[in-house]
């Protein structure tokens, strides 16, 4: 990690962690949180923390336990960003936020990774957020890793095929990742390069890809 073998104390100091708004004592105010963190992180930047608190409109006299979900997330991010991490670990960081706050958070994270020395590892059930933020996406379902691939490669390699149930049976089985037949027709998640020219294909979003992998009939 960061060119070092193992996770050393110095490496830990370069990691910012946000665990779904958890991890901060509910009895503390924002200034009190800053004082606690200053004793934990060797590279804590009090000025940066004060600036993040201002940017996030965190009240000085309100306890963390009285914050809304969005305010809790902002408090956790203020902490995570104020010791100048190289890596942010985010667990369901956008879940439960209203659309405006979530959009603000995504913009902030995109700004963070514009620095080539920064990276984000995020877990989320909000796939649209992953599409905006991530270069590489891994899909876990029931403890199994179904895929781990570059986002652009996923879009280029896979597509949605549309047709009748009869036409579906004529497709090369190696082309079909999963399929779904309804009273209105058939659709399949396919590998573009293995379907015949002239087939009716539409681009597949990452969310559609995940849903078809889980809910569609797997032909493997």
Predicted regions: what is each one?
Residues 178-220:
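C-terminal coupling/interaction segments
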Residues 1-128, 132-141:
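ABC transporter nucleotide-binding domains
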Residues 88-92, 167-171, 194-198:
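Short, surface-exposed beta-strand/loop "edge" segments at domain boundaries and coil↔beta transitions
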Residues 105-190:
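ABC transporter nucleotide-binding domain
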Residues 9, 47-51, 152, 166, ...:
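Generic alpha-helical secondary structure signal
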């Amino acid at each position: 990690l960061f060119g070092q073998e193992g996770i050393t104390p110095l490496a830990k100091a370069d990691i910012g962690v946000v665990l779904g708004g958890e991890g901060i004592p509910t009895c503390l105010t924002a200034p009190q949180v800053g004082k606690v963190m200053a004793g934990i992180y060797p590279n804590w930047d009090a000025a940066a923390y004060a600036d993040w608190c201002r940017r996030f409109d965190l009240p000085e006299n309100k306890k963390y336990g009285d914050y809304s979900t969005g305010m809790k997330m902002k408090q956790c991010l203020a902490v995570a960003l104020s010791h100048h991490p190289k890596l942010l670990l985010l667990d369901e960081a956008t879940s439960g936020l209203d659309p405006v706050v979530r959009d603000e958070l995504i913009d902030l994270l995109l700004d963070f990774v514009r620095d080539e020395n920064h990276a984000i590892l995020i877990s989320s059930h909000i796939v649209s957020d992953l599409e905006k933020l991530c270069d590489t996406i891994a899909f876990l379902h029931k403890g199994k890793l179904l895929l781990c691939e570059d986002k652009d490669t996923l879009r280029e390699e896979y597509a949605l095929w549309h047709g009748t149930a009869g036409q579906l049976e004529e497709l090369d089985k190696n082309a079909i990742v999963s399929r779904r037949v309804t009273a209105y027709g058939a659709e399949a998640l396919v590998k573009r390069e293995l379907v015949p020219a002239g087939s009716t294909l539409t681009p597949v979003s990452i969310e559609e890809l995940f849903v078809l992998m889980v809910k569609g009939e797997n032909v493997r």
